[in-house]
Swiss-Prot record:
Region of interest: Disordered: 1-153, 321-341, 416-448
Claim: Phosphoprotein is one of the keywords in the record: yes
Family, as annotated: Belongs to the MTC1 family.
Residues recorded with modification Phosphoserine: S273, S436
Subunit-level organization: Interacts with ribosomes.
Protein name: Maintenance of telomere capping protein 1
Source taxonomy: Eukaryota, Fungi, Dikarya, Ascomycota, Saccharomycotina
Gene (UniProt): MTC1
Keywords: Cytoplasm, Cytoplasmic vesicle, Phosphoprotein
Sequence ranges of Acidic residues compositional bias: 125-141, 436-447
Other remarks in the entry: Present with 2160 molecules/cell in log phase SD medium.
Record organism: Saccharomyces cerevisiae (strain ATCC 204508 / S288c)
Biased composition (Basic and acidic residues): 77-87, 95-124, 321-336, 421-435
Length: 478
């Protein structure tokens, strides 16, 4: 309690010191506040020991001063019309206010002490926050990079120059390549001559022959016209026999020499392929060009045709060899390879001749038909094969076919041995026609050539197969 009283007294004295000096009876009254403060402090420390005159004087001065204040306050309240409290109450209020201020100051001092401890941490936080705010402001201030604008800037500055330089380099390289290719083309054309052409042909020959052990070149000699499947039938029959009975690869090439009876070789009329159909399917009629006479005479004619074709082939082959010798650009190794390859190529000539035996005079009533290759009124195919490479010759005759079949296929009048028989047959046919005129008018027209053409083709194909088999047997020496 003593401490609280002392603090209140000190507060009062401090307040009094802050007031201006008052006049007392025309004299300035100077209250010795410090002395009174010391007296009060001394009284608080030793209340019973210190009761001097200085303390009384100080108290009197204070009371006088308070009275003056009260008077002044009363005068002010009279003017304003407001009642004022007693000076003691005002002093107490002021003391309470001073206490509140002191408590606030104490709290503030404590807060300042705690705040001083927290100041460095708060400063660091504030600095970090300020830095973050500055960075955010910088990010907001810095604009986003526009890719189109950057590309346009690059193109306007250095990109166009780089692209133009690259374009110029590529154009120069393209022109250089073009000039070089043109020069190489000129050099290539200058290097090509007859020797290179012959070398290419020789290499092609090596390729064709090298893939197989032997090549059969079959040359057909005949007078048949509009026979579409002749080459196919011969090639298929030879391939059938050789592939099943001979080891190693053998290739077969078939060509036609045309009409050897004429002076020189004339090109054969173009025939349709096998896909076009069998005999007689073309617009033009099939022509066999039969030889009427003895079989021996027909064989002589077939051999003559064959020999003529061989001579023509030999002359053409000799001219080819002369051209190779004139080139004279083949080394010894190539010549030896050519000679070895030529031994693997075999040239075969096949002559095809249909021979018809003339029909003798006979009675019409006792007629009966005989189908045979040696019987009059029939024909057969005589096939003569000659291998000029291996020196092999064979003769094959087909089965007999009626001559009237040829007449149906060719669309001509039936051929007989004498004019008398022709007249007799005509009169006999006329009688039959008159008797059956009424019946034939209603009947449909029949084409017998459609019946017989397949049998002729099958018989000729069978003869080709027999000829191929005989050739293989002769090659094997059996």
């Amino acid at each position: 309690m003593s401490e609280n009283k002392n603090s209140e007294a000190e507060d009062v004295f401090e307040f009094l010191d802050s007031l201006p000096e008052a006049k007392n009876g025309g004299k300035m009254v100077n209250t010795d506040v410090k002395g009174s403060q010391e007296g009060v402090k001394g009284g608080s420390n030793s209340v019973a020991g210190k009761t001097g005159n200085d303390g009384k004087k100080g108290d009197d001065d204070i009371f006088e001063f308070l009275e003056e204040l009260e008077k002044s306050n009363l005068s002010l309240t009279d003017k304003k019309g407001v009642e004022k409290k007693a000076p003691s109450e005002s002093v107490n209020n002021k003391a309470q206010d001073e206490k509140v201020e002191e408590s606030k100051e104490n709290k503030n001092s404590e807060q300042d002490a705690h705040g001083k401890e927290k100041e460095p941490q708060q400063q660091e936080k504030e600095e970090e926050e300020e830095e973050e705010e500055e960075e955010e402001e910088e990010e907001e201030e810095t604009p986003l990079h526009d890719p189109i604008a950057s590309i346009s800037n690059w193109w306007s500055s250095s990109g166009s120059a780089k692209v133009s330089s690259i374009w110029n380099k590529t154009a120069e390289q393209a022109s250089q390549i073009k000039n070089r290719l043109a020069q190489e083309q000129l050099d290539l054309t200058s290097k090509i001559n007859t020797s290179t052409i012959t070398e290419i042909a020789r290499n092609l020959q090596k390729i064709v022959v090298g893939e197989t052990e032997e090549v059969l070149r079959i040359h057909l000699v005949h007078d048949l016209v509009n026979y579409p499947s002749l080459q196919y039938n011969i090639e298929s029959k030879f391939d059938q026999v050789l592939s099943s009975q001979v080891e190693g690869g053998i290739r077969i090439f078939v060509d036609e020499w045309g009409h050897p009876n004429n002076n020189g070789i004339t090109p054969v009329e173009k025939k349709p392929s096998v896909a076009d159909g069998e005999l007689g399917n073309s617009k033009k009629k099939l022509q066999f060009n039969l030889f009427d006479g003895k079989v021996t005479d027909g064989e002589k004619l077939a051999f003559a045709n064959l020999e003529n074709a061989v001579k023509l082939f030999n002359t053409a082959h000799e001219e080819y060899q002369k051209q190779q010798k004139e080139a004279d650009a083949t080394p010894d190794d190539d010549r030896s390879s050519i000679s070895s390859n030529s031994n693997k190529i075999s040239d075969l000539f096949i002559s095809i001749l249909p021979i018809a035996i003339p029909q003798k005079q006979k009675d019409a009533d006792g007629d009966f038909q005989v189908t045979d290759s040696n019987t009059p009124g029939n024909f057969n195919f005589t096939l003569v094969l000659k291998d000029i490479t291996n020196d092999i010759t064979t003769i094959t005759r087909s089965q007999g076919f009626p001559v009237k079949w040829v007449n149906w296929l060719e669309g001509s009048v039936e051929k007989t041995g004498s004019t008398a028989s022709e007249e007799r047959n005509k009169s006999y046919d006329q009688k039959k026609q008159k008797e059956s005129e009424d019946e034939d008018e209603d009947d449909e027209i029949i084409d017998p050539s459609e019946w017989v053409k397949e049998w002729i083709e099958d018989g000729l194909s069978l003869s080709f197969g027999v000829m191929a088999q005989n050739y293989v047997i002769d090659r094997m020496g059996l």
